[in-house]
Amino acid sequence: MRVKTGVVRHRRHKRLLKQARGFYSGRRKHFRKAKEQLERSLVYAYRDRRQKKRDFRKLWIVRINAAARLNDLNYSRFMHGLKLANIELDRKILADMAMNSPESFTKIADASKAALTK
């Protein structure tokens, strides 16, 4: 007996087109284009999950550097001073402090300066 793929193919196409929702034009409506775009989008998603970590670290460093320069230090000397002063705050917290509570950041910068002068 011959087995036809009608139901299976329809289900597979439907599942893939459902995943392609939100794509533009034929990349949403046509199975082959949708399949190609979906594969590409999964590659982008995989790559960018890793890149997001690098991007946030860069952003934090830029923010810390800007705040450190307001306190007469550059980023590398500021971080070195923190290490000498045994202040263990990560870059995410430091960047948040630089943005939302500059007075606290200034106190930490002063501690960093003091550790550098010793």
Curated annotation (Swiss-Prot):
The keyword Transmembrane does not apply. GO terms for molecular function: rRNA binding; structural constituent of ribosome. CDD domains: Ribosomal_L20 (cd07026). Keywords: Ribonucleoprotein, Ribosomal protein, RNA-binding, rRNA-binding. One of its GO terms (cellular component) is ribonucleoprotein complex. Binds directly to 23S ribosomal RNA and is necessary for the in vitro assembly process of the 50S ribosomal subunit. It is not involved in the protein synthesizing functions of that subunit. The gene is rplT. The keyword NAD does not apply. Belongs to the bacterial ribosomal protein bL20 family. PANTHER family: 39S RIBOSOMAL PROTEIN L20. InterPro entries: Ribosomal_bL20, RIBOSOMAL_L20_CS, Ribosomal_protein_bL20_C. It holds the Pfam family Ribosomal_L20. This is Large ribosomal subunit protein bL20. One of its GO terms (biological process) is translation. Signal peptide: none annotated.
